[in-house]
């Protein structure tokens, strides 16, 4: 067992906590999104985030209300709908609607920043990284997570088509799933490292998480979860009856995924802890 594997196991042991991050996500989100966000929320419990904290791509603020016990200082997002939802949740002291490539903040204003499953959706990610570096103090931590190079090859339907010799169809399926996931970047650390260094960040540590069988649950959840999408569009809520009894079976199905060690070499997402260069 190599040093990196031992370090990954230590990370997971440290991030085990008695707080339940699964249920607060499960009662508000489709189950396939809930399990991923619950795993990610657990990682942040060992990440030091000195104030003021910037959340790059805060969305509707749902994740921040669950992952952090205190309000984050500033949430930034380019879309008005999610910003208004975030305001209603009270997850941030201040909310700003702006493009991440043109932030309305002075140089070296923030002491830390996060971006949870956001950077993969941004075509101009290099510009956003440069702006994030600009508004961070020298030495400030920047923590984020993104899907990686394992994501698309691991999709179950694509792999099944590969085994049948239908590689062209498999690649078309992967392109389709990437499109509905709104991904512009599913890159390995070898791509992220020079990208971050060019923007002025140094990677302190990273790990892959969310194993293939967990991705398959997420993948099929996109199809089985279509009723939740209809509910969201008609009522504004993903889950119409967010009660323990209604979601008991769903919770039981995904509980093992939440409780198992999510850190693995073939994980399809990567968690990065970086620091603004001095």
State each model region's role.
Residues 122-123, 136-137:
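Helix-to-beta-strand junctions that scaffold the AdoMet/dcAdoMet cofactor pocket
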Residues 274-277:
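Active-site beta-strand termini and strand-to-loop segments that position acidic
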Residues 63-64, 123, 152-153:
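Glycine/Thr-rich phosphate-binding loops of Rossmann-like dinucleotide-binding domains
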Residues 115-118:
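A short beta-strand submotif of the Rossmann-like class I SAM-dependent methyltransferase core
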Residues 126-131, 141-272:
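S-adenosyl-L-methionine-dependent methyltransferase catalytic module, highlighting the catalytic core
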Residues 1-102, 106, 112, 129, ...:
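Conserved N-terminal segment of class I S-adenosyl-L-methionine
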């Amino acid at each position: 067992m190599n040093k990196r594997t031992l370090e990954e196991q230590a990370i997971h042991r440290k991030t085990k906590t008695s707080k339940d991050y699964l249920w607060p996500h499960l009662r508000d989100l489709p189950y396939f999104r809930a399990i991923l966000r619950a795993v990610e929320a657990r990682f942040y419990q060992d990440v030091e985030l000195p104030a003021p904290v910037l959340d790059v791509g805060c969305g509707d603020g749902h994740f921040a209300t669950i992952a952090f016990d205190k309000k984050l200082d500033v949430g930034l997002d380019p879309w008005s709908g999610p910003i208004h939802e975030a305001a209603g949740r009270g997850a941030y002291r201040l909310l700003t609607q702006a493009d991440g490539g043109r932030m309305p903040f002075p140089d070296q204003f923030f002491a830390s920043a996060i971006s949870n499953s956001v950077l993969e959706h941004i075509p101009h990610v290099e510009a956003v990284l440069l702006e994030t570096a600009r508004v961070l103090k020298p030495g400030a931590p920047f923590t984020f997570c993104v899907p990686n190079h394992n994501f698309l090859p691991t999709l179950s339907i694509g792999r099944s088509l590969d085994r049948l010799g239908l590689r062209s169809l498999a690649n078309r399926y992967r392109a389709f799933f990437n499109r509905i996931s709104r991904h512009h970047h599913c890159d390995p650390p070898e791509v992220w490292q020079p990208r971050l260094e060019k923007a002025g960040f140094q990677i302190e540590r990273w790990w892959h998480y969310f194993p293939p069988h967990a991705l398959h649950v997420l993948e099929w959840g996109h199809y089985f979860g279509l009723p939740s999408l209809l509910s969201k569009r008609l009522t504004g809520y993903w889950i119409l009856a967010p009660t323990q009894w209604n979601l008991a079976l769903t919770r039981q199905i995904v509980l093992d995924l939440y409780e198992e060690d999510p850190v693995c070499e073939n994980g399809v997402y990567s968690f990065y802890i970086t620091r603004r260069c001095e």
